[in-house]
Curated annotation (Swiss-Prot):
Listed name of the protein: Protein transport protein SEC9
Species of the source: Eremothecium gossypii (strain ATCC 10895 / CBS 109.51 / FGSC 9923 / NRRL Y-1056) (Yeast)
Domain t-SNARE coiled-coil homology as annotated: residue spans: 318-380, 470-532
Biased composition regions of type Polar residues, renumbered to the chain: 92-102
Keyword presence, Coiled coil: yes
Transmembrane segments: none
UniProt family annotation: Belongs to the SNAP-25 family.
Coiled coil: none
GO molecular function: SNAP receptor activity; syntaxin binding
Gene3D superfamilies registered for this protein in UniProt: 1.20.5.110
Signal sequence, renumbered to the chain: none
Amino acid sequence: MGFKKFFGIRPPEEDTPERNRDLLTEEGIATKNPNSFRKEKFAAYGKFAAANAQDHVYAPAGYEQYARPGAGADKDELESLNRAATDAGDIGNTSRVGQPQQRDPYAVNDNYNPYANGTARDPYATAQPYARQAPVRQAGPRHAAGTPYGSAAVPQGGPGNPYGGSTAGAGTGRNPYQKNMNATVYPPAAGKTANPYASMAQDPYGKGEQRGIAGGPVAMPVPMQPRPQAAAETPRPQAAAEKRAPAVDVDDLNAVIEPTNEDDDLNNSIHEGNEGLNGQGQAPRRGFQTFEELQREQEMKQQMEEDEEVDEIKQQIRFTKQSSVASTRNTLKMAQDAELAGMNSLGMLGHQSEKLNNVERNLNLMKVQNRVAEDKVAELKRLNRNILAVHVGNPFTSKRKVREAEERIKNQRMQDKMQQEETTTQLMSSTNRIENALNDERHSVRERYQRDQALERAKKYQFENDEEDDEMEFEIDRNLDKIGQVSGRLKKLAIAAGQEIDSQQSRIKRIEEDADDMDIRIHLNTSRLTNIR
């Protein structure tokens, strides 16, 4: 039974973070309040940067999926990368027994290849070429299906085709001169004999026949197109009259002749046309021009050329103004886009400055608490020394040591306050710099009266100004003025961004140095605690 159980000695309970914070506050040590909330002015730009952040990966073309975490790490995908092309499972040209063969995705479907499509026309299109096949019926002679002697329908007993009623076959039991009823839709004219050669216009080797194995046509009768009426072979008198050329108009010799133009009447006297002139007829036309006429004609021609040149200049001016309007619009659009990008960049720099300020404040707090930890470690080491080592204070130097300790604490506190004020000043300077650059100060009063000034300046470039021309001049002047304003704001944004980047670089460097120093101090305190026995 140990002394701890005998005397009921138990280790103290471990303090919670809230209890430690209260103890540090009671001793006058600075702590961080978890309930305090600092308002951030550029938090929206932080959200914007997080939403537009992209994870850039570097991988060869086609392997981007393996660069992202969790993608391409499956076992099957890894095995597929290590699988050889000669493995049994990857050979695509061979198929197992009982499984259908896969279709080649790179095969070309040729409609003109008779062996590409398995149709009824190809006797070799079956999947099993050595299986038992049904015999193919073939016609005997070449003219079995398309003979001209079987296409003319003649009444029984008429003096028509003498071979129409023949039943003699050509080795197959089929009449090669059999009538084709589908080819004779209209009966022949009464009292006339049908032309036995009327159907010779049809090609017996057309697409109605199908070639068989032996080179002859396969016995597959295809209905032929109906031929026109036989009566159309002998045109009717009315049709012949209609086809006759139109008759030429012939003058009626019995009609009364009426003069078409009284002025050109040949029966009039030669003096009738000169009556009333009294010897004063029209002036004869001269074959030359006077100097005044030539000068007048030259002036008119010169005036027309000048008018054409003026019109051409007007068109060029109009085209140039329209091009200038479009150019100023595009320039203003690009300038506004550049300004928006600069404002977003500067806003994100402001959000970064606020985050750096939080890091600096936390580092300052860590410095203060680490100094307290150093004092506590030294006190713990003194209390944990040998019981025989008696420590007796020097009464002659005790007051001096107390004054030195108080002075040291006061100086340290002043140094901490100055460092805290410097951190706050840097944040305020960064915020004011960014706010001044982001503020868009537009003078509405100036924009209200600039129309009259723009039109007054544009008068020397106009010579026939209308409402549309005034609008173009005003838009050009307004766009140029806006481009100048945007350029000034862009310059201000660029200067502010450069100053902010320089300031943040120095702050980041100082944070890095403080973090390294803090790491060394914490490691040193940990080593001291480990050496205490």
